[in-house]
Each structure stands twice: as structure tokens, then as C-alpha cells.
């Protein structure tokens, strides 16, 4: 009986709101807010429309003339756009808490993001997913989730958890979970691997979306991948790859982030022939990029300056992602849609003047309206600060008795070459030692190799951001500083450390699972930029991002050589060398 009463109460509350919205829409009651004399993007007719926009209960009640509101704001001379949607991002890549991320992107017009929490899931397993769900509850940026499909990324990785479909299945019942995130194991899908396909089948059983990750996949393998139920991809770097997928019914997420930038290459898609199934995403967005360039607004601005029709750019930044994810109450300015607005001066300058979330002003052109961080279960908060299980290391732990393979770095890329073998560090020849230390289960596993092209002349650089399992990775010109740098990362509870002659020259603490900081974004960026500068002073090549590049050296899905906790792995030939 209690359930029936609770249900009846819920219906009554919703009915009262609906009555208010309908009364406002019909003009019989005043709106909560009216944007007067607005010129707005009509995503349905591909044109600019004009009139008042009436808001009630956080929804758009109507557009037209002569609406009255408790609050009325004149929009003459401005443009009103739907709130922006990032179709695919890993929030952890910003290195800050979800609250800090929201605070950073609101001024850029972002009102919804679709996140894949696979970074923290690789460290904390299902506790990591639950942590992120709690940390994003009721933020002024609506955070929706796609569940990680590949934890760990490959069987070679020693991650903090192994998640099969059973482990994540209950999360599909959460009202902000939209589906299964990027299916990186496209080989497993194409080869009909049952353990891979059961994850897709489980998501489909819950009527959820499955996102893709299949760079360069073509022919029958691509057919098999899509036939399995994967209907989007964000890994296209060429128009040819994208069109092959569009022809087969996939949506294309045009990515312009920090680690990968594909907008310029994919601009030909933003034409009437192809744009209908395209949307924008960032994938990874680092602090400096967020502060200096922005978020989805940066992609829209760039596209318009490149000659793309502004309405096409706006639709790819809002309506298309909402439609793909079946978020049918956002991404447009129309009756019944969420009152998520971005107000700009004009398409040419594209300065964001105001941002509204559910009809509430969240950015006034200068400051973000303050909001509280969500409460996180104390057990989860404590767990997120206790993710390092590593013994104290000595220089001797990095001494090896035989030649090891050399990872050859490629300028501006995260792929590597096979650069032969080395027996010792040779700073003169730019041969440095690199190691990956398992940090989740205290296995004492340390994989050792060499790397060429990093440029370090002295000291060591260590980080607990090491895709995708986030063990500790370190590069050094001597074993003593390598050990000291790793030990300092552990002392911090996670972070980035630049060490020379036993002294810390720069560091950034990442105490949330070893991959995110609790500090404000500006402070994180300052610490990160200082650490970068110290790494450059120690000789790291200026064309190399000292930490981002290093963080990908352990990802065993990218050719040619990678380093795991068990040694150097040849991705092409699928064997240790």
C-alpha cells in the first residue's frame, strides 16, 4: 500500500507541474521566465526563428508572441541556441572532480555530457562507476553514462578490476545510464567472441545503445561489427573511413579533444549530404585546453570559421547527440524540451553571453552561479583515496640483466616504432629507461624496457595516469631518480612527479583513484604546467607532451611496441619481446 501511495504522490506532483506548463503554454498563466524578442536556432526547420521563449518548471512551454513572465529578459540583438552536448568524453581526463569539470564547461555552453568512466573503473571496478554516478548527481551539467565495455582494455593489462557483463548489468537500471561505451575490442566482435558479444547482447536486452571504437575497420569486419549492434564511432580520422561507416548506418562522432583532433580532416562531413548523422565530441579534454580553448563551443567556433553552415554546426553540437542517445527532451528549442540555452552575440564572433540550465541562469558572461558538490558515500570516498598497493622501491628494482627492447617515439603521435634493443641508459643517444609498476594488488610486477625520442637528459618523470589500467609509469636517465619519483607518486596517493637528483622539481597530486585531483581546475593547471616546464628543463623534447605521451606507452591496443607490467609487448605480432 505504501508503494501505491508513493506512486500516487509522484503522479500528483508531476501532474501539478504539467498543469503549470500547459497553462503557461496556453497563455493563461505567467511563465517563470520569458526570453523576449529572441532570435533562436530552429533545428527542425534549419533556420533562425523569432519570438518570445516562455519557460515553466525548467521546460520550454512555448514560443511565439506576447508571453508574460515573472522574469522577462530582452534578447534583442542576440542569438539563442540549444545547450551543447558532448557525445563522448572521459571526465577523468580533465584531472579534476566532476564538480570542477562542470564549473569549467558551463561558461562554454555545455549542458549535457555523455561520459564513459572506464578510467576510474580500471582502478576501482564497479566502485569507480558508482563513485562517478554519485559525484555527478544533480550537477548543473547533466552527466549521462555509458558503461565501460573493456575493463581491462586487453587481457595483457593488470588493472584494478575485471568487469564482465554480469558485473555491470545492474547499472543499466540507473536513470542516467544510456548504454555500453566504446567497444574497443572490435576484433573480438568481428570474430564472434562470445564473451565480447554477450556484453552487447546484455546492453540490448536493456534497450540501450552501444558505442563504437573501430579506427580503420572496413569490409566484412566492419559489416560484422555493425551487425552486432554497434551504431556509432568516434575514432574516424579520414573522410573515407567515416563515409564507409555512414553508408552502413553508423553515426559519426567528430572528435576534437586534447589527445586526438579530427575536425579538420572530417570537415567535408559537415555538408547537407552527410551531416545528419554526425555529432561532436571531445573524448579527452585536459585542463589547459579547457581553460584556453573551451569545450564543444570551440568545435562549433572552429567549424563555422572553416565555412560550415552555422546551423549545421549547432545541430551537430546539440540536437544530433540528443537524438542518437534518445534524450528526446533536449537539443532543441521547442515546447516540452528542457530550457537549456546558450546565448551568443553572433555566429562570427561566437562569444557566449549567458548559459541557462532548465531555465536557471548558470553563467552571466562573467561568473558561474555557485553550486554544491554532490555528497559521496564515505566508503566510496575513502576507497578512492586508497588505490595504491605498492612496496617501497629501490634503484636496484630497475636494474635488469639482459638487453631490453626500445620503444621508438614518433613526434606528434602516440604510436611507436621498434627501435631495436639496448643494454643500458645512454643519454647521449637519447636511450632512456622506462618501467611500468603494478599498483593495484601489490604483485611486485615491474616491466622494464627502453625508450628513444623522449629527450630527458637528467632525472625522471613518473605518473599514475597510464592508460588504461593506470599503473605507475616512469621514464628516467638513472635508476635512483626513477625509484624516488615512483615512491613520491605513491606518497601522494597518485599524481605526476618530476624528479632530479632526489629532489622534486614539480608535482601534481591526483588523490582520487590516482587519476583526478580534488583541487580547483586553475590550481591543477598551474601545477601541471609547472611540472611540464620542469620536465622540459630536464631535456624532454618541446614537441613532446611529457605526461600525456608517457601515459599512452602502456596501452597495448596501439602499435608497435608497448610496455606492460610484464615487459615490452609487440602489438603487431602479439608477443612479448
Model regions and ranges:
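Divalent metal-coordination and catalytic microenvironments
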Residues: 38, 58, 77, 88, ...
Amino acid at each position: 500500500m505504501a508503494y501505491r501511495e508513493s506512486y500516487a504522490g509522484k503522479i500528483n506532483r508531476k501532474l501539478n507541474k504539467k498543469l503549470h506548463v500547459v497553462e503557461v503554454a496556453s497563455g493563461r498563466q505567467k511563465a517563470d521566465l520569458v526570453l523576449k524578442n529572441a532570435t533562436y536556432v530552429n533545428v527542425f526547420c534549419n533556420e533562425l526563428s523569432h519570438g518570445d521563449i516562455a519557460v515553466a518548471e525548467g521546460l520550454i512551454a512555448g514560443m511565439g508572441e506576447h508571453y508574460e513572465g515573472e522574469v522577462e529578459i530582452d534578447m534583442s540583438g542576440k542569438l539563442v541556441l540549444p545547450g551543447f552536448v558532448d557525445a563522448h568524453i572521459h571526465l577523468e581526463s580533465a584531472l579534476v572532480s566532476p564538480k570542477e569539470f562542470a564549473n569549467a564547461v558551463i561558461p562554454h555552453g555545455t549542458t549535457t555530457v555523455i561520459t564513459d568512466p572506464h578510467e576510474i573503473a580500471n582502478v576501482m571496478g564497479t566502485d569507480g562507476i558508482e563513485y562517478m554516478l554519485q559525484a555527478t548527481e544533480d550537477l548543473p551539467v547533466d552527466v549521462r553514462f555509458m558503461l565501460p565495455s573493456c575493463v581491462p582494455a586487453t587481457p595483457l593489462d593488470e588493472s584494478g578490476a575485471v568487469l564482465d557483463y554480469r558485473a555491470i548489468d545492474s547499472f543499466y537500471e540507473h536513470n542516467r545510464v544510456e548504454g555500453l561505451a566504446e567497444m574497443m575490442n572490435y576484433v573480438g566482435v568481428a570474430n564472434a567472441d562470445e564473451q565480447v558479444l554477450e556484453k552487447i547482447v546484455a546492453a540490448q536486452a536493456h534497450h540501450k545503445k552501444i558505442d563504437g571504437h573501430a579506427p580503420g575497420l572496413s569490409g566484412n569486419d566492419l559489416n560484422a561489427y555493425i551487425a552486432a549492434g554497434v551504431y556509432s564511432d568516434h575514432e574516424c580520422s579520414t573522410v573515407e573511413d567515416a563515409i564507409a561507416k555512414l553508408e552502413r548506418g553508423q553515426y559519426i562522432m567528430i572528435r576534437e579533444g586534447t589527445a586526438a583532433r579530427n575536425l579538420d580532416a572530417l570537415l567535408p562531413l559537415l555538408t547537407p549530404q552527410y551531416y545528419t548523422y554526425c555529432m561532436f565530441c571531445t573524448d579527452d579534454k585536459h585542463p589547459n585546453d579547457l581553460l584556453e580553448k573551451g569545450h564543444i563551443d570551440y568545435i562549433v567556433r572552429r567549424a563555422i570559421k572553416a565555412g560550415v553552415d552555422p546551423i549545421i554546426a549547432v545541430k551537430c553540437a546539440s540536437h544530433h547527440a540528443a537524438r542518437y542517445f534518445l534524450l528526446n527532451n533536449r537539443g532543441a528549442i521547442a515546447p516540452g524540451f528542457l530550457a537549456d540555452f546558450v546565448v551568443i552575440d553572433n555566429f562570427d564572433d561566437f562569444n557566449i553571453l549567458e548559459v541557462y540550465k532548465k531555465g536557471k541562469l548558470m553563467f552571466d558572461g562573467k561568473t558561474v552561479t555557485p553550486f554544491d558538490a554532490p555528497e559521496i558515500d564515505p566508503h566510496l570516498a575513502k576507497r578512492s583515496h586508497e588505490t595504491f598497493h605498492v612496496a617501497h622501491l629501490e634503484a636496484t628494482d630497475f636494474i635488469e640483466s639482459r638487453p631490453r627492447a626500445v620503444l621508438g617515439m614518433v613526434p606528434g603521435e602516440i604510436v611507436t616504432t621498434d627501435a631495436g634493443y639496448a643494454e643500458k641508459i645512454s643519454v647521449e643517444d637519447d636511450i632512456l629507461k622506462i618501467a611500468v609498476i603494478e599498483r593495484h594488488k601489490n604483485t611486485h610486477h615491474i616491466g622494464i624496457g627502453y625508450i628513444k625520442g623522449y629527450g630527458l637528459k637528467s632525472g625522471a618523470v613518473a605518473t599514475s595516469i597510464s592508460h588504461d589500467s593506470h599503473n605507475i609509469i616512469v621514464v628516467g636517465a638513472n635508476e635512483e631518480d626513477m625509484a624516488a619519483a615512483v615512491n613520491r607518486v605513491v606518497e601522494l596517493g597518485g599524481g605526476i612527479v618530476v624528479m632530479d637528483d632526489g629532489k622534486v622539481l614539480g608535482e601534481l597530486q591526483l588523490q582520487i583513484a590516482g587519476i583526478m585531483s580534488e583541487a580547483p581546475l586553475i590550481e591543477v593547471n598551474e601545477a601541471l604546467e609547472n611540472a611540464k616546464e620542469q620536465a622540459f628543463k630536464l631535456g624532454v623534447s618541446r614537441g613532446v607532451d611529457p605526461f600525456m605521451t608517457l601515459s599512452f606507452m602502456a596501452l597495448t591496443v596501439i602499435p608497435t611496441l608497448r610496455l606492460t607490467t610484464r615487459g615490452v609487448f609487440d602489438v603487431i605480432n602479439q608477443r612479448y619481446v
